[in-house]
A protein has these predicted regions:
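Acidic/polar N-terminal loop/beta-strand segments that form early-domain functional surfaces
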Residues: 3-5, 15-16, 51-53, 80-82
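Canonical Radical SAM [4Fe-4S] cluster-binding loop centered on the CxxxCxxC motif
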Residues: 1-30
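A C-terminal junction/extension of Radical SAM enzymes
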Residues: 154, 160-163, 167-206
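Radical SAM/AdoMet-radical enzyme domain recognition
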Residues: 27-50, 57-169
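Short acidic, glycine/proline-rich loop/turn micro-motifs
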Residues: 22-23, 113-115, 180-181
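A short, flexible beta-alpha/helix-coil linker loop
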Residues: 17-21, 108-110, 174-178
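A generic structural signal for secondary-structure junctions
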Residues: 15-18, 98, 117-121, 198, ...
Length: 206
């Protein structure tokens, strides 16, 4: 993770305001991360995934990724992003050899996107998605499934894979209330998600 900051405010991840993010002295510099990855590469690590927060809110991320791809022994540098500021960087990602990008996208409905993220960035995300498909970079969608929020999107995301060269991964919502007396169990775990998919696609092979 290159930052804990994000330009969206997804309700299941963080409050809408009053956040206290880490200051610069509390996170690794790019130089420190390059040194760390170089050491790990010498030990046999060959793949690196960039995450956040939202990685692209950190200044000079793309030059940093170019440095990562140049490290001997690193065969793949991938990134997970919300896609809001991705489109303009795709040509450079392509030129440096980035082969896979994951976009975090919980709904295909613009109004519902605003309800979930509390930001009006749906058009920007979809523009990034289309540009990514056009670039030939392997594209994946990560969708967190939540009761009463985006169940209709499960089948919609599946239909997307029929027309677009994209992989979709459905993710269980992670509870943030620990495992004590106040623990709220996950209402849509992987088994329930899979069963819901099979209702519409009975010939699905797991």
């Amino acid at each position: 993770a290159v930052t804990d900051r994000c330009n969206l405010r997804c309700f299941y991840c963080m409050p809408e305001e009053g956040l206290q993010f880490s200051n610069r002295s509390q996170i690794l510099s790019y130089e420190e991360m390059i040194r760390l990855v170089s050491i790990l590469a010498e030990l046999g690590i060959s793949k690196v995934r960039i995450t956040g927060g939202e990685p692209f809110v950190r200044k000079d991320l793309v030059p940093f990724m170019e440095q990562l791809t140049a490290i001997s022994g690193i065969d793949a540098v991938n990134i997970t992003t919300n896609g809001t500021d991705l489109a303009r960087h795709i040509p450079r990602l392509k030129s440096m050899g980035i082969k896979s990008v994951n976009i975090s996208l919980d709904t295909l409905d613009k109004a519902n996107f605003f309800k979930i993220t509390r930001r009006d960035e749906f058009d920007e995300v979809m523009n990034s998605y289309r540009a990514l498909l056009g670039s030939g970079i392997d594209t994946k969608i990560n969708a967190v499934i939540m009761e009463e929020h985006n169940l209709d999107d499960i089948h919609g995301m599946c239909e997307l894979t029929k027309t677009d060269p994209v992989s979709v991964r459905f993710i269980e919502e992670m509870p943030f209330n620990g495992g004590g007396k106040g623990y709220t169990p996950i209402s849509w775990n992987k088994d329930r998600i899979l069963a819901h998919i099979k209702e519409a696609y009975p010939n699905l092979i797991k």
